[in-house]
Amino acid sequence: MLKKVLIANRGEIACRIIRTCHRLGVATVAVYSDADRDALHVALAGEAVHIGPSPASESYLSGDRIIEAAFCAGADAIHPGYGFLSENPDFAEAATAAGLRFIGPSGAAIRAMGLKDAAKALMEQASVPVVPGYHGTDQNPDFLLSEAERIGFPVLIKARAGGGGKGMRRVETAVAFRDALASAQREALAAFGDASCLIEKYITHPRHIEIQVFGDDHGNVVHLFERDCSLQRRHQKVIEEAPAPGMPEDMRRTMGEAAVKAAQAIGYSGAGTIEFIADSSEGLKPDGFWFMEMNTRLQVEHPVTEAITGVDLVEWQLRVVSGEPLPKRQDELSIDGWAFEARLYAEDAERGFLPAIGMLAHLDLPEDLARIDSGVHAGDHISPFYDPMIAKVITHGPDRATALSRLSTALAEVRATGVATNASFLRRLANEPDFAEGNPDTGLIERHLAELTMAHPAPSEVVALAALSLSGALEPAAPNDPWARLPGFRLWSEAADFVTLDHRGHHVAVSFSRRGEGAYAATVDGRDIDLHPGRSGDAYLTETDGRKHRLHAIRGDRDVTVFKGGESWHFSLVDPLAGDQEEAGAGDRIVAPMPGLVKLLRAAVGADVSRGETLAVMEAMKMELALSAPRDGRIAEVLVAEGEQVLEAAVLLVLEPPPETDHG
């Protein structure tokens, strides 16, 4: 067994690897950038080495610095985790050449599967079915358009290198093809250093089903069954499960055999995933799946496989790289129950899933209800430099319905403040009828996006509790305070307090008065309610109109977030003396919705633009975001340049004021 492992990663995967190493008695070394100096993975590791500035390109993607850190710490192996350098064959070979063990496949195996076109050709030779498409090297836009027309729309443009949904675009028509190709190429170049793309037929009722494989250096390869990753948004996985619902046993066997065959074709050793796309238009069938790509690393969603097989995949990685054979044969592996994983992100689903940046002021995760893999804690800063994942919530049960119910229950108990999260979106998705009935597909989220992301109005009891919290009324009274037990009293008038709250730009007026110990009368937007907020552990039990509600109120300096039934509402106090702060002409400004890089500018001073026309493209947290003109008009000012880093709310462009309408 290894003596000391350096984890060349950050966040939840670094923490997860560290925990298995500690269980096995293997010493650990973390690496960190400036932004991660106080990160959880740094605190958990036995020691930590600083590797550079905050941008990943200068730290977590610097192979030379990581190898040097391993030597300085006396590590005998490097675990790359996922992302960053995990599928970089040059890094794997450099680590090996330096005398370190790379906890993953060989550089040759990574290289063989890293370019999707070459990988598909290799799979065809190994008799593994592949999706119809163009996988050649000609990148001329006219030629690629002709290939797309030959294949037939809709098509999928995919980056030749890399994965994770980067450089991927679904295109419905020939008219939209060129812009989509250019965008995919820019994104691919930024993410992988290779702008080339391939074209594939888009399956109209697709299921994303992948097989976990594992090989060793003794020629053994097994599969650990399938995962269904069909719930996706913009090709990014959202909720994964294992096994796949509706999977016939003959198809499970056929897919497993195909995955093993794929791994054997490249002499694979270590953990890997063979991703297939399956046509579910007439149910899952053994002849209705095709190879998409192989991920030559541990997957984000590996915990669901661990849950149904009882296998610690990181432990297997450590044993295999130490020269041991696989701990189990294929006939010793079986499926036990069902498991789900939901990816909890700092992002605002109601605002188009914009990444949320800032301090994570408060964080409660339901560790008594689910397995929680997290790399952050309260007080951490969610930065623009890395993926904004907060945690993975994993549940297991004897059957699908039980495991899914446990997931929904666990998600309802997530409470985070300081930054927006997608917890409510995930819970709604877990309860979506088609998904609950076992009918997932990659288009499900898009079809139901409106109801999954709509803003729910705050119930009166939520608003009233927010007002009481911000007024200080819920703070415990001093011991033996005689006034605490008396109804409010003011000379000549009823004792009432008034506050105005702001929720996403909407103001709501609340008045309330004490009606005895622990009782209040409140008026919310003209509706009278009686409120009896009593504490039950860390929750408030409120009674309104004869019904009891369980709520949580987490207060900041001048704001409060109230949680109820898996939904949350953030309120801030409105200063009654403050006037309207909206500046005239604000609608003529195109501003940055988050910190990031100005990737592309399509506007010049004096240019006429149309409403909805893309004027700039920003990149942040590995996403491209198009900013469009709010109205027809003419560009008055361009305040930034391509390649410039900007802060949230920075003004990028200004339109000329609209001409005044002559009513004469």
Feature names for model-found ranges:
Residues 312, 514-539, 544-550, 558:
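Conserved nucleotide-binding/hydrolysis modules and their immediate coupling elements
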Residues 548, 554, 558-593:
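Catalytic P-loop NTP-binding/switch module of NTPases
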